[in-house]
A protein has these predicted regions:
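N-terminal low-complexity, Pro/Thr-rich disordered segments
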Residues: 24-79, 273-286
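Soluble non-cytosolic domains of exported or imported proteins
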Residues: 71-72, 81, 118, 169, ...
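Solvent-exposed, polar/charged alpha-helical surfaces in well-ordered, non-transmembrane soluble domains
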Residues: 75, 79, 85, 169, ...
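Surface-exposed amphipathic alpha-helical segments
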Residues: 247-286
Length: 286
């Protein structure tokens, strides 16, 4: 699999120069941070959960799939998180992902740039605000967990949680509409600077019970220098549980990593909801 080359600089350089991103201090592995209450996901435990605690309730004999009836537990959510082995390449798992925030996502959408005015602008504002606060699928109704990985100046945030089937279906339908509603719009940042945002649909592997992918491009300035943030956003429904992947950075997006995270993550979640312990992912890439 061909992967684009990346700058050798590390994420902390981008943070130090203040070009894009802010990260608040956060303790513990992949946890839901006290310092960043906007994040919905629960803290990831380094210990391996027992098989019996991965999901609650048993599927009925007539149920077509275990994922349709099982509820995700806290231990199950942690077990469903992907690992470095799942996405491979040069990704490194980090312990502060719950506090990640992208400054370029903060701003007020320009209502005047929409033909149908306030209605469309509200959807686009919701998109930016929910991406910033890690709540694109809403607040989990049950158990949840998250983890994150870095590679150069790119970051991949992976969330899994029980959101409820109906809520997830509405979220996926809403995401599907954004490529038309929010195809291009302008945002005014807190510094008064103008940013251009483009949203397009992106393809995902045919996994889960429903899925939707978007690619978001934000162009603006930081410290007087032009800067571009490009993000893949991918959501998958498995029963009443959902997966959300946000991947990218100022150097662009590795779409292959997004697709791999979606594919491997869906498989892990399905195994957990079936009452199984996800098996380690074998290395298959050069």
């Amino acid at each position: 699999m061909h992967r684009p080359s990346r700058p050798a600089r590390v994420l902390t350089l981008a943070l130090a120069t203040g070009t894009l991103l802010v990260t608040a201090a956060c303790a513990g592995d992949t946890g839901s941070p006290e310092a960043a209450p906007a994040s919905p996901a629960a803290k990831q435990s380094p210990s391996s959960p027992s098989l019996s605690s991965l999901s609650s309730s048993s599927p009925s004999p007539s149920s077509p799939s275990a994922s349709a009836t099982r509820a995700l537990t806290t231990n199950g959510a942690k077990a469903a998180l992907i690992t470095e082995a799942d996405i491979e390449d040069a990704w490194t798992q980090v312990n502060n992902a719950a506090s990640w925030r992208d400054k370029l996502l903060v701003g007020k959408v320009d209502v005047a740039s929409f033909l149908n005015g306030e209605t469309s602008s509200q959807d686009c504002q919701k998109l930016l605000d929910s991406l910033y606060s890690d709540t694109l699928l809403g607040r989990p109704a049950g158990a949840s967990a998250l983890t994150g990985f870095t590679q150069g100046d790119a970051r991949l945030l992976y969330q899994v949680g029980d959101y409820g089937k109906g809520s997830l279906e509405k979220s996926l339908d809403w995401m599907k509409s954004l490529a038309d509603t929010c195809d291009q719009f302008t945002v005014t940042g807190s510094d008064g600077g103008k940013r251009t945002v483009q949203v397009v649909s992106s393809s995902l592997p045919a996994v889960g019970d429903g899925r939707q992918g978007l690619t978001l491009t934000v162009q603006g300035t930081s410290n007087g220098e032009p800067v571009t943030l490009k993000l893949d956003v991918a959501a998958v429904r498995v029963g009443s549980s959902g997966i959300l992947v946000t991947n990218g950075g100022p150097s662009g997006v590795d779409h292959d990593s997004t697709e791999t995270a979606v594919q491997q993550g869906t498989q892990r979640l399905q195994q957990v909801l079936a009452g199984k312990t996800p098996s380690p992912t074998p290395t298959t890439l050069d």
